[in-house]
């Protein structure tokens, strides 16, 4: 999407053109909340950050002058607890929600850099207490099959976490690990000695059916991320991870944001407008435009946002990582960031 352009004054005093997104994604490419929260909120206060295009290496600038909403993505968003109040300070009116990937691969050691599961569940609950219901979405992503993990193992892992999150979230998003489609993932798993197993359609259906049965005690919205397979017969829908409907529900009082999304907010009495959905008691939204991001994968439902992260910068060291070419590349960039932690770039250079 072509965002509006503004001019910024860089740290070195130079003037530069920058795109000024209304919705920011932080980030699909790295774990900003876990490792770069201090950097991000510093750059938010400065007013801009630099971003390098992963396809052509061209550096550009992102201004936060027009930002009204942030979608955070993380496996360990605990550092956000110290910063969330800044979204509403210094004249800002920025709302957010968190896509919280809360997996359990502790026994198998697939996510060596994340905190213990109990700590991550505690963080989830603290964030909900801070932000309110609907602001923290549970992701178990990806669902991986290996010589040590079968479908029943995954279901037990999901059930354990799902039981503990009841009352703290209303949604579970998941995906089946499609390893063959991602060369980096395949290479990382093979180099780390993980004997993975590709999902077949029968296993996908088996998992979906059993998950649907488990969900009778939770009543979560179940959704897949970027999946071609249709399993709606089990009450599982295709997700929008950057979700205009959720953004509208959480920030319907923000007229600038609603105008951008093409959402008209109405108080209702006996008559309810056609094709509307409830955002609060007695308040509905009617959308007049489709906001799907054409730059995402074919089966991705996300709306347009500006991602500000960069690949090869996440030190979680997950064995199946799609965002790092190698562990060494990520650690090298992380060390470089620590030498210059508030640089305009996430890598410190």
Model-derived segments and spans:
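Conserved Radical SAM active-site core
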Residues: 1-111, 117-133, 325-349
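A C-terminal junction/extension of Radical SAM enzymes
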Residues: 202-298
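Surface-exposed cleft-lining segments at the edges of enzyme active sites
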Residues: 106-114, 142-152, 190-199
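Conserved C-terminal portion of the radical SAM core fold
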Residues: 119-186, 207-227
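Local cysteine-cluster metal-coordination motifs and their immediate loop/turn environment
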Residues: 297-326
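Short, solvent-exposed loop/turn segments at secondary-structure junctions
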Residues: 77-78, 103-105, 143-145, 179, ...
């Amino acid at each position: 999407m072509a965002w509006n352009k503004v001019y910024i004054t860089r740290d070195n005093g130079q003037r530069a053109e920058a795109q000024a997104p209304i919705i920011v994604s932080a980030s699909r490419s790295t774990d900003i909340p876990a490792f770069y929260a201090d950097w991000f909120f510093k750059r938010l206060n400065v007013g801009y950050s630099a971003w390098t295009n992963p396809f052509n290496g061209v550096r550009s600038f992102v201004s936060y002058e027009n930002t009204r909403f942030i979608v955070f993505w993380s496996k360990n968003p605990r550092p956000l607890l110290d910063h969330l109040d800044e979204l509403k300070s210094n004249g800002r009116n920025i709302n957010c929600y968190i896509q919280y990937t809360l997996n359990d691969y502790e026994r198998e050691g697939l996510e060596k850099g994340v905190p213990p599961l109990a700590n991550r569940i505690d963080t989830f609950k603290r964030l909900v207490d801070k932000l309110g219901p609907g602001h923290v979405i549970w992701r178990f992503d990806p669902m991986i099959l290996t010589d040590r993990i079968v479908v029943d193992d995954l279901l037990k892992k999901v059930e354990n976490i799902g039981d503990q999150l009841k009352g703290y979230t209303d949604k579970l998003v998941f995906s089946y690990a499609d390893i063959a489609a991602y060369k980096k993932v395949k290479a990382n798993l093979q180099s780390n000695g993980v004997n993975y197993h590709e999902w077949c359609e029968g296993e996908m259906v088996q998992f979906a059916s059993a998950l649907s049965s488990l969900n009778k005690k939770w009543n979560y919205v179940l959704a897949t991320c970027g999946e071609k397979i249709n399993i709606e017969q089990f009450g599982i829908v295709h997700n929008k991870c950057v979700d205009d409907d959720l953004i509208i529900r959480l920030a319907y009082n923000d007229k600038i944001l609603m105008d951008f999304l093409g959402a008209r907010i109405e108080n209702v009495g006996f008559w309810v407008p056609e094709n509307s959905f409830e955002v609060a008691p007695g308040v509905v939204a009617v959308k007049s435009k489709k906001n799907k991001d054409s730059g995402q994968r074919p089966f991705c439902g996300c709306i347009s946002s500006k991602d500000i992260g960069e690949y090869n910068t996440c030190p979680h060291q997950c064995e199946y990582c799609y965002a790092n070419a190698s562990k060494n590349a990520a650690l090298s960039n992380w060390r470089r960031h620590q030498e210059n932690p508030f640089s305009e770039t996430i890598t410190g250079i």
